Amino acid sequence: MKQLRKWISAVLVLALALSLCACIRPEPTEPAGPSQQPAQPTTEPTVPGPVTYHYEKTDQRVIYDHVIILGVDGAGGFFTQADCPNLTNIFSDGAITHTATTATPSSSAPCWGSMLLGVSPDVHGITNDSGLPRDGEDFPSIFMAVGRAFPDAKLASYVHWPNINTAIIEAREDLPIKKVSSLPDQYIASKGAKYILENQPKLMYLHFDDADAAGHSDGYGSAYHLQTLEKIDRYIGQIYQAIIDAGMADSTLFIVVTDHGGTPEGKHGGDTAAEMQILFAVNGPSIMANTEIQLNIQDVPAIVAYALGIDQLDTWDCVLPDGMFADIPGGA
């Protein structure tokens, strides 16, 4: 009988312990940092899409309240080979090219540096190994130009690759920028969309990196690379839907741009067409409909400045592309 009581007591203790464990929920975890292996997304973004929005086009001068730029690392001009309904729908009445020219060398830091600073890599000197913070006094970025023109404006940069937020975009106490770095692309999209909804930023840059990783892994233009572009197309739709939901669409210039392409062998940095040709797409009320444009990646600051109604900086070496804005159909 004594042994039976011990056995019953042990069973009761075990049952109690199991019930307590079942009631304890694990604490939620933040996305992995740059030194950790990021968790693989278990779900795709929920987008009621493909996203469609029809602008009331005008040939009058429009001063935009917002500019949102999506940078897709390593996508080059390969979107034409993938099924990307959001990209197609959003820019169906906008201006787009899949053969814009990137900077030389066709690597991430030189190219994103030229896009954000408005000068060529041989001038700004930023490489993939650059990591130290810069104050931007030598070559100010579009963030400094916009921040000084609109001191109370909300500025944000959400990037997978942290060097963009350290070595390219300024780090200054007098230039408050909401910077988020080292997140997987899925979180760049979800957290970026949330920020847009809650803050309606004047200028925001979002950087997606999965396409470049896929290109290095399986080759640029490979099935895996193109599948990754299709996934990023859903992120593009997610961000654009946030712009619509925030009531910003009619006052936002929306840009999608890539930095470089690559070879079937998974390389880039050279001057072949596969490495140098990139996507540039833009839409807004004053963007000429169904227009194919040509530009260099370092012309982006001129586009941003014109859209927001501010002067270009003297350090910039960039021009407005011909036929982009309806009020200046011949360019500037």
List where the protein language model places each region:
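Short, structured active-site-proximal loop/turn typified by the sulfatase FGly-forming signature C/S-X-P-X-R
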Residues: G77-C111
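Metal-dependent active-site segment of extracytoplasmic phospho-/sulfohydrolases and closely related
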Residues: I68-I69, N86-L87, K231-D271, V304
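Bacterial signal peptide processing site
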Residues: I24-P26
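Substrate-binding rim/cap in mid-to-C-terminal beta-strand-loop elements of soluble/periplasmic
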Residues: P110-G118, G270-D311
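C-terminal motif of bacterial Sec signal peptides marking the signal peptidase cleavage site
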Residues: S19-A22
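Catalytic-site neighborhoods of secreted/periplasmic enzymes
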Residues: H124-N128, R134-D185
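Active-site His/acidic residue clusters
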Residues: N165-L175, A193-R234, Q238
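A short beta-strand-to-alpha-helix junction
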Residues: V62, T104, L132-F139, L226-E230, ...
